[in-house]
Amino acid sequence: MRIPCLLRPLLGWFFGLCILFSALFGNYIITLFLGLPILGRHKQWRNLMDRAISYWMTIPMGLLEFLMGVRIRVSGDEIEFGSPAMIVMNHRTRLDWMYMWCALYQINPWLITSNKISLKAQLKKLPGAGFGMAAAQFVFLERNAEVDKRSFDDAIDYFKNIDKKYQILLFPEGTDKSEWTTLKSREFAKKNGLRHLDYVLYPRTTGFLHLLNKMREQEYVEYIYDITIAYPYNIVQSEIDLVLKGASPREVHFHIRKIPISQVPLNEQDASRWLTDRWTIKEQLLHDFYSEEQPINRQFPVERGDGVWRSWKEPRRHFYVKLTSLMFWTLVISFCSYHIFFVRTLQLGFLYFFVISFYLSWRYGGIDKYIIFKWQESRKSLQKSPSSSSI
């Protein structure tokens, strides 16, 4: 359904406000359960957060598809739920990770409960959503090699110890593809005697290699999923365009290749070259994709045995889950927005959330860092006790 241009900014503002208010209410609920990690109940905390926050994720997914008219097409290999893995993907826009939720939902709705994303640390400061993503234990990167390595190490140790099998999304390019980053990538290619890439940026291998080595060390990786994202009609670069202008891509396509970890070289230099080679393949794939003049005909090639998932042909139960979730959160937003002015209990509840949120940010660097801190404390106390087990 094509939406008139005059209505687009209104839809964008509505989208942004729904995300903000639903996230604030959800964050208040999250803080009510902080007693679990305090008491050392880390598995129960993680199970609760994974399910609760993935239920909230159906709001942006539903709004993108039902309100903004975004269509999702996924082709290639299926991502296995219940197997720890790394996902590497090109970073075309600042919003790729949000469309990724829609893609995972099409393959298997449970995948949105087991997907963890590495993101720029600035996104933790997003009003409402930032706190929720931190509670989901996404990995926030500071662009400081030593700090980021420690963040990866803590995350993998934590996930392994509580026996949760996640698929961790990494953007090896380190940033989205803009005019400025394309220029920097071109300078890098020229300096290192490499050919210029038109559709992707050259991947930065330091973070990839460290995460790969850590996951291998902990026996926490079975596959690497190489995902290519493309926009056949129009590209919307940032959240500013989405919220303030109401701009959204008409379709987003994903192509997945599943690679057993045994096929990835053990030597760091060879693994670095392997990743660069994957990006060269990705460049050719995107070149062929965009070489098709008619956007309606732009699709990734499907080989024998590949799956194809389309949001406009999804199973009816998947559709109704998103629809009922969207209706539920719309009622929650309406109820809270009205009663926050009159109900003292609700006012005190939100005051409690803001105080807790500020304290966790000031004292620990965020709820994600607090959870890691409490988990490490629990491990130390168990190691001192006569009998210890995983938490």
UniProtKB/Swiss-Prot annotation:
Biological process (GO), any one: phosphatidylinositol metabolic process
Chief site of localization: endoplasmic reticulum
GO molecular function, one term: acyltransferase activity
Tissue specificity comment: Expressed in seam cells, vulval epithelial cells and the major epithelial syncytium hyp7, and in several head neurons including AIY interneurons.
GO CC terms: endomembrane system; endoplasmic reticulum; endoplasmic reticulum membrane
Localization terms from the record: Endoplasmic reticulum membrane
Protein topology in the membrane: Multi-pass membrane protein
Protein's pathway: Phospholipid metabolism; phosphatidylinositol metabolism
Enzyme Commission identifier(s): 2.3.1.-
Domain of life according to the entry: Eukaryota
InterPro entries: Acyltransf_C (IPR032098), Plipid/glycerol_acylTrfase (IPR002123)
Transmembrane region(s): 10-30, 52-72, 97-119, 323-343, 347-367
Alphabetical UniProt keywords: Acyltransferase, Endoplasmic reticulum, Membrane, Transferase, Transmembrane, Transmembrane helix
Role description: Acyltransferase required for the fatty acid remodeling of phosphatidylinositol (1,2-diacyl-sn-glycero-3-phosphoinositol or PI). Mediates the conversion of lysophosphatidylinositol (2-acylglycerophosphatidylinositol or LPI) into PI (LPIAT activity). Has preference for saturated and mono-unsaturated fatty acids as acyl donors and sn-2-acyl lysoPI (2-acyl-sn-glycero-3-phospho-D-myo-inositol) as acyl acceptor. Contributes to the asymmetric cell division of epithelial cells. Asymmetric cell division is the fundamental mechanism by which multicellular organisms generate cell diversity.
Similarity comment text for this entry: Belongs to the 1-acyl-sn-glycerol-3-phosphate acyltransferase family.
Protein's name in the database: Lysophosphatidylinositol acyltransferase 10
Source species of the chain: Caenorhabditis elegans
